[in-house]
């Protein structure tokens, strides 16, 4: 077993690991590449996204990750140095992990700023750290990209070996079975909360409303009516129907949202244009217009079963338009397309009153410093208990007359 080598920047330059404990018919070796562009798209997608014609998880698609790099959004310059971990057997790709060397904690949505501050107060360096995630994307999905348990075990071992050159390893928004595997390797479980809507076989939006309590049903109808009375009309554009001018308008709205919060946007027009060109089947744009002029829009990303609410912005303020573009239109779209889930993202208890229920999301964390690891383990136990109570309290405020069952 050869331990990973690093340069002065903390960037991995080579990695060769043979994990005999999980090797079956042939040896598996792991190596690092510093750009998704070093991996042919069909090779990566066969490993990460076997679904067709629409990816099982478009955020792991080669085209999505390449757009992040080529647009300059996720690069060493922005604090996201790509470190894709590849597991190979007989020269063929058997597994992969989207790893990044991070010099900050922005754009992650599992917040560890307090951990970094504690390290700094004790004269320790928290950065660079090693992160497994999709940049700027708090969406769940596989992180140990492999077809069998043995390969996933090998990936976990290789990632932890690589992490010994850094302060820590963080695997964000992973599925339960992967987190369980990582826990068995000594990583710490962390829980957080998002809000998802589930399709209970609704015929249309009115059918969905009929499952809500009278007050919630009344409130939603009033909110939608007020948007119509403001003279706003909505259009849903998909795929090739989203033209260059639409992307330009959306990017203006996206930048406006960040400007209103006095922050810099993570993404740019080039990124969105690349998505429209390379992943058109996964793109959905909700466009709000008044008197024939576009005034606001939201971007949704879809796969075969799920629609994901991603970004929103408006050039004119219309009360309640945010709810229409970001919740009601996506729910209508999901019902129309017979999709199972609409993921509305993190934060905002107001979502529960609009039919999005709390869902726990999971991440796994390993810290090299033993004393900090013990302290954070104790913190995560307390935090996890608090998250469980929070979810129970939210569910007590369910807007549904009866809890819907996904169909």
Describe each region flagged by the PLM.
Residues 7, 11-407:
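N-acyltransferase acceptor-side catalytic subdomain
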Residues 1-4:
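Ser/Thr/Pro/Gly-rich low-complexity, intrinsically disordered segments
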């Amino acid at each position: 077993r050869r331990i990973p080598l690093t340069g002065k920047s903390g960037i991995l330059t080579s990695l060769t690991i043979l994990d005999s404990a999980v090797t079956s018919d042939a040896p598996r070796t792991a190596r690092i590449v510093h750009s998704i562009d070093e991996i042919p798209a069909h090779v990566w997608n066969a490993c990460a996204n076997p679904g067709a014609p629409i990816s099982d998880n478009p955020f792991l698609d080669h085209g999505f990750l390449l757009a992040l790099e080529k647009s300059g959004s996720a690069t060493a310059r922005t604090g996201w140095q790509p470190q894709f971990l590849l597991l190979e057997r007989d020269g063929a790709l058997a597994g992969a992990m989207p790893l990044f060397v991070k010099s900050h904690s922005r754009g992650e949505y599992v917040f560890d700023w307090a951990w970094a501050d504690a390290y700094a107060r004790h004269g320790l360096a928290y950065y660079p750290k090693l992160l497994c995630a999709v940049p700027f994307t708090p969406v769940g999905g596989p992180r140990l990209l492999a077809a069998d348990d043995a390969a996933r075990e090998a990936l976990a071992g290789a990632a932890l070996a690589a992490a010994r050159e850094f302060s820590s390893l963080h695997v964000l928004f992973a599925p339960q079975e992967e987190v369980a595997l990582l826990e068995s390797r000594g990583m710490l479980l962390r829980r957080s909360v998002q809000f998802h809507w589930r399709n209970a076989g609704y015929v249309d939006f009115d059918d969905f409303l009929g499952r809500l309590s009278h007050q919630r049903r009344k409130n939603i109808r009033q909110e939608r009516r007020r948007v119509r009375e403001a003279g706003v009309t909505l259009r849903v554009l998909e795929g090739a129907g989203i033209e260059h001018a639409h992307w330009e308008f959306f990017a203006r709205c996206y930048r406006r949202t960040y400007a209103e919060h006095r922050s810099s946007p993570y993404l740019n027009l080039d990124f969105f244009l690349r998505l429209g060109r390379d992943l058109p089947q996964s793109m959905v744009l909700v466009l709000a217009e008044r008197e024939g002029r576009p005034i606001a829009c939201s971007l949704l990303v879809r796969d075969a079963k799920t629609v994901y609410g991603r970004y929103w912005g408006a050039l004119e303020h219309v009360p309640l338009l945010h709810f229409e573009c970001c919740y009601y239109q996506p729910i209508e779209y999901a019902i129309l397309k017979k999709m199972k889930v609409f993921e509305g993202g993190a934060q905002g208890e107001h979502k529960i009153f609009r039919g999005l229920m709390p869902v726990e999301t999971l991440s796994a964390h390993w810290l090299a410093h033993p004393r900090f690891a013990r302290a954070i383990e104790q913190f995560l136990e307390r935090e996890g208990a608090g998250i469980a109570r929070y979810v129970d309290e939210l569910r007590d405020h369910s807007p549904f007359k009866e809890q819907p069952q996904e169909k």
